[in-house]
């Protein structure tokens, strides 16, 4: 049965973690109007019905993708070029990327810190937020440390940069230091993701599976977006750590794009539901088209973020 406008709006609010005011802003209308639609006191005109439908699919996730649209999205994404040197030598660009990547990736994993909170913590080493947990504040600083470590490695080694087991373990150590007891080590126990149908790797097989993944990460790639989707999917299915797999995986995806001179993808916290949906489809059915589209669109998100920030 087709969901009502009210049901779709409620799902958008829940999954995007928006207020009614934020939802109204994304629909270019007033909060009062959105409230009337949600409570079925008013019916949106066709123009807004179409906007709601597109926003709903964007947040909740599509079920398929037209091949021509996929091709166009991928072509647009790979045309957005940037190098790690471009980022490191421009403090404004580095700060914007660090702030937004840290905020969105940690929020996806449950952090309640706002963008302003993260900015405060990253800008002032001595800052302590009394209304946020110590863990959340450590997570923000640790994420920056892990990101800077990878960026420096890529910048220093340039075309000699390769992915290694030690690099991945060091990234996890920096990311999860003071948060988990086994930071910087592969898990030595079984694991499952609550609510997911994906069967994760047996911990005994993790070292061998990581070696296989490293060979793929270090091999040439013709279709970069497909390459990013498949390697990201593979890492998350291996799920090599007791915690922090999503954040490490998105860091690897981010830096892998930079390694190939492409604008890195920013996975928005509002699109967490769609992201997980596409990832699960790829992992279970080996159908990567939706995840490819999502990654391509996430690259454009980063491009637009930098374009808007540098023009301010």
Task: Tell what function each PLM region has.
Residues 1-243, 247-312:
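FIC/Doc superfamily catalytic core
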């Amino acid at each position: 049965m087709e969901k009502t406008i009210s049901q779709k709006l409620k799902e958008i609010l829940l999954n995007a973690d928006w207020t009614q005011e934020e939802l109204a802003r994304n629909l270019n209308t007033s909060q009062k109007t959105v409230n009337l639609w949600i409570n079925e006191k008013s019916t949106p005109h066709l123009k807004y019905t179409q906007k709601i439908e597109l926003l709903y699919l964007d947040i909740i996730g599509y079920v398929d993708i037209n091949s021509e649209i996929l091709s166009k999205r991928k072509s647009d994404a790979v045309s957005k070029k940037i190098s790690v040197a471009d980022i490191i030598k421009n403090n404004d660009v580095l700060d914007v990327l660090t702030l937004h990547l840290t905020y969105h990736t940690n929020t996806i994993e449950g952090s309640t810190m706002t963008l302003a909170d993260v900015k405060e913590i990253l800008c002032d080493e001595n800052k302590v937020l009394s209304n946020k947990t110590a863990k959340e504040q450590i997570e923000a600083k640790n994420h920056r440390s892990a990101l800077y470590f990878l960026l420096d490695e890529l910048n220093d080694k340039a075309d000699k940069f390769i992915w290694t087991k030690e690099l991945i373990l060091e990234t996890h150590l920096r990311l999860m230091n003071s948060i988990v007891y086994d930071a910087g080590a592969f898990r030595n126990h079984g694991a499952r993701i609550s609510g997911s149908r994906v069967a994760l790797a047996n911990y005994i097989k993790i070292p061998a599976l990581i070696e296989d993944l490293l060979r793929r990460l270090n091999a040439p790639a013709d279709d970069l977006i497909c390459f990013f989707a498949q390697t990201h999917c593979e890492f998350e299915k291996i799920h090599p750590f007791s915690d922090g797999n999503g954040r490490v995986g998105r860091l690897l995806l981010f830096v892998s794009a930079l390694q190939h001179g492409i604008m890195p993808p920013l996975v928005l916290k509002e699109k967490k539901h769609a992201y997980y949906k596409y990832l699960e489809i790829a992992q279970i059915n080996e159908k990567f088209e939706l995840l490819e589209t999502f990654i391509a669109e996430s690259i454009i998100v980063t491009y637009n973020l930098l374009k808007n920030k540098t023009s301010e």
